[in-house]
Amino acid sequence: MKFSPLLDELIQSLRCLPGVGPKSAQRMAFQLLERDRKAGLKLASALSSAMSDIGHCQSCRTYTEESLCPICASHKRGSSSTICVVETPADVLAIEAGGHFSGRYFVLLGHLSPLDGVGPEELGLALLERHLASGDVAELILATNPTVEGEATAHFIADMARRHKVVISRIAHGVPVGGELEYVDSTTLALSFNGRIPL
């Protein structure tokens, strides 16, 4: 059966979301149309506002509606000499949820991937280098993902930071709290053994 053009457009538009296939998109569209049109209109309004009004922080590159995000605009956090480098704005939220970091962030919005055409320019590394050259950064914490690309990105940034005499550290990798060793992959287990600490 062929749907009306507007319904088909809605279903196809919902498929742009990660993990949403044709059947899931169809169920979402029908849910909004049959049971919750008010929520559908609210969703449409929120999407429209977000797409037009959310940009990037001029200092750290995370998402914000202002020129500076709340962390960079904060007198306490914005003047911190410690910067944590992450790949995505979602990483900022994850670290903030832990409540153990009180410095600033720099969001790469990806990782180095020459095959995909992602180089230093696309990651905003010129802006990060300006931060490092300012003399206001004492420590750079590299919190990129423990993937091949994340490690390559961390090494590239570490080399850049060394030129500016900045202390560089890398977040630890290893066995998760509450995890059982029999379910941990061999690479993670090797990292845990190599990064062990004395008690």
UniProtKB/Swiss-Prot annotation:
Zn finger intervals (C4-type): 57-72
Domain of life where this protein originates: Bacteria
PROSITE patterns given in the database record: TOPRIM (PS50880)
Gene Ontology annotations of biological process type: DNA recombination; DNA repair
SMART domains cross-referenced by the UniProt entry: TOPRIM
SUPFAM superfamilies: Recombination protein RecR
Similarity field: Belongs to the RecR family.
Function: May play a role in DNA repair. It seems to be involved in an RecBC-independent recombinational process of DNA repair. It may act with RecF and RecO.
Classification via HAMAP family: RecR
Protein's name according to its UniProt entry: Recombination protein RecR
UniProt source species: Shewanella sp. (strain MR-4)
